[in-house]
């Protein structure tokens, strides 16, 4: 005599949403059961639309991918449908990946969490970062929503050129001294991908200070010295940036000669006006 809705697994191991209710006909007790693929509950397309709501959300906000997972770690929805789609992020081959560890953390802490960049096999081994949020109802985690952050979108922001001159750039560096945004001036050696792949560490006194939590504007030798072995003197402004539990270095730099050339030019204009 009970009626309820539950998420169960079919013979192929896919989650299905099952509705059941009792039904009495001519004094006989029957059971009315309705099943629907769990993924279809979230990915239906409106009439005339080419993309479902989650795909449009993913594209509009600039994420690389959007995942939905059951409380036991099964990824039943992915926008890009890479190798992690329809695998278990707690017990499967990607359990020790950044996303797998994030899912475990979200289930343990029952709150929004982030995973810093690290190589991720389903993305061709390129560095990937994730954010995730549990959906909680009746005191239980019913669903996990996770997004893979787009490196392209981070670079679009960090490589804005207004006010940077010819030799200026802004960039992000993690606690492991790998890039978190790609260098504008040396993308061959210091893109995020090459930084991780070739272990090209972006080290400078300014970056280390920012990672210690300091904020300042100084003149010093920038990170390219780790490759060129030559000092590249810059005017550097740096500050720490919190990303979940991690601290990144946010640095804006411009070549010393270019920065002082601007000052000398301004002084010359002011002198001319004074005459």
Specify the residue positions occupied by each region the protein language model found.
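Membrane-proximal, non-catalytic sensory/regulatory domains of signal-transducing membrane proteins
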Residues: 1-25, 67-70, 101-136, 168-171, ...
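Loop/turn elements at helix/coil->beta-strand transitions in domains of secreted/extracellular proteins
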Residues: 29-30, 61-64, 110-113, 248
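N-terminal membrane-entry
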Residues: 261-275
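Polar/charged side chains located within well-ordered beta-strands of beta-rich proteins
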Residues: 10, 32-35, 65, 169, ...
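Generic detector of intrinsically disordered, low-complexity, polar/charged segments
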Residues: 10, 83, 89, 95-97, ...
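Solvent-exposed, extracytoplasmic
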Residues: 1-3, 38-68, 72, 81-101, ...
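Conserved beta-strands of PAS-like sensory domains
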Residues: 15-46, 123-159, 235-239, 246-262
């Amino acid at each position: 005599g009970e009626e309820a809705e539950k998420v169960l697994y079919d013979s192929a191991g896919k989650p299905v949403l099952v509705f059941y209710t009792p039904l009495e006909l001519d004094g006989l007790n029957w059971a009315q059961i309705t099943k629907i693929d769990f993924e279809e509950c979230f990915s239906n397309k409106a009439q005339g639309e080419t993309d479902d709501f989650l795909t449009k959300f993913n594209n509009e906000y600039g994420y690389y991918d959007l995942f939905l997972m059951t409380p036991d770690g099964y990824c039943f929805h992915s926008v890009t449908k890479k190798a992690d789609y329809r695998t278990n992020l707690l017990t499967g081959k990607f359990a020790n990946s950044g996303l797998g560890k994030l899912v475990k953390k979200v289930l343990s802490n029952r709150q929004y969490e982030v995973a810093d960049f690290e190589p991720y096999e389903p993305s061709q081994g390129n560095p990937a970062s994730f954010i995730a949020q549990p959906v909680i109802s009746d005191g239980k985690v019913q669903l996990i929503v996770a997004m893979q952050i787009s490196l392209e979108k981070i670079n679009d922001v960090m490589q804005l050129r207004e006010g940077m001159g010819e030799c200026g750039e802004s960039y992000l560096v993690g606690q492991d001294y790998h890039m978190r945004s790609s260098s504008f001036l040396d993308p061959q050696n210091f893109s995020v991908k090459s930084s991780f792949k070739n272990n090209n560490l972006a080290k400078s006194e300014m970056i280390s200070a920012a990672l210690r939590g300091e904020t300042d504007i100084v003149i010093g030798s920038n990170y390219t010295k780790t490759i060129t072995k030559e000092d590249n003197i810059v005017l550097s402004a740096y500050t720490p940036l919190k990303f979940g539990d991690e601290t990144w270095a946010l640095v804006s730099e411009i070549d010393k000669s270019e920065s002082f050339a601007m000052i000398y030019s301004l002084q010359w204009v002011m002198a001319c006006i004074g005459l």
